A protein has these predicted regions:
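Bacterial N-terminal signal peptides that target proteins for export
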Residues: 3-21
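Active-site-proximal beta-strand/loop segments in catalytic clefts of secreted hydrolases
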Residues: 50-53, 73-75, 96-97, 110, ...
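Rossmann-like NAD(P)-binding element
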Residues: 88-91, 95-130, 134-142
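Active-site phosphate/pyrophosphate- and oxyanion-stabilizing loops and adjacent acidic/basic residues
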Residues: 81, 120, 156
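Bacterial N-terminal signal peptides
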Residues: 16-32
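Rossmann-fold NAD(P)-binding glycine/threonine-rich loop
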Residues: 135-170
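NAD(P)+-binding Rossmann beta1-loop-alpha1 motif at the extreme N-terminus of oxidoreductases
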Residues: 35-82
């Protein structure tokens, strides 16, 4: 019998949904609490966000509301003042280097075309970190790295660029 609910899904789309579920589960507060509630004392995860645009700020806001400590980074951290002031003491703003030092978990929310420069500037700082990779290569926008990711796969390309990081594809 064929499962009609998933028959129109591509394998990649199904994998993305499953990966997002596991990432959410991994970063969720302890059982018995809801995402909107603060995490119980002592269970907070320190998360560094690289790229605090639409995706990074939205996901980071949810993590702060769930009780985790989040450092939002940007090339211009002063532009994040309103965001972090509105989220309270668990949120702060800083540079990419500060986010990498701060976070036990790193969330990357920048265009995929920025990954080679990110790797060049901060590659060794990803070593040993759990890296939640939200990047998706778009050929028209991301040039050569987009072509490379299309041919070899985004996960393998990210793993090569961010060598030493424990890559989790999430989006």
């Amino acid at each position: 019998m064929r499962n009609v609910a998933f028959s129109n899904w591509t394998r990649r789309a199904l994998h993305r949904v499953v990966a997002m579920f596991w990432v959410a589960l991994m970063l969720a507060p302890l059982p018995g609490t809801a995402f909107g509630q603060a995490a119980p004392s002592g269970s907070s995860i320190k998360i560094g966000i690289i790229g605090s645009g639409n995706i990074g700020s939205t996901v980071g806001t949810l993590w702060v509301k769930a009780g985790h400590q989040v450092l939002f980074s940007s090339r211009h951290p002063e532009n994040l003042k309103q965001l972090v002031d509105g989220l309270g003491p668990r949120a702060r703003a800083g540079t990419v280097s500060e986010a990498l030092t701060f976070g036990d978990v790193i969330f990357i929310g920048v265009p995929y075309g920025a990954y080679p420069q990110l790797a060049k500037d901060y590659g060794k700082e990803f070593s040993g970190k759990i890296v939640l990779d939200a990047g998706n290569a778009v050929l028209a926008r991301d040039g050569e790295i987009g072509k490379d990711a299309r041919e070899k796969g985004v996960a393998l390309t990210s793993a090569r660029l961010l060598a030493g990081g424990r890559i989790v594809r999430g989006f």
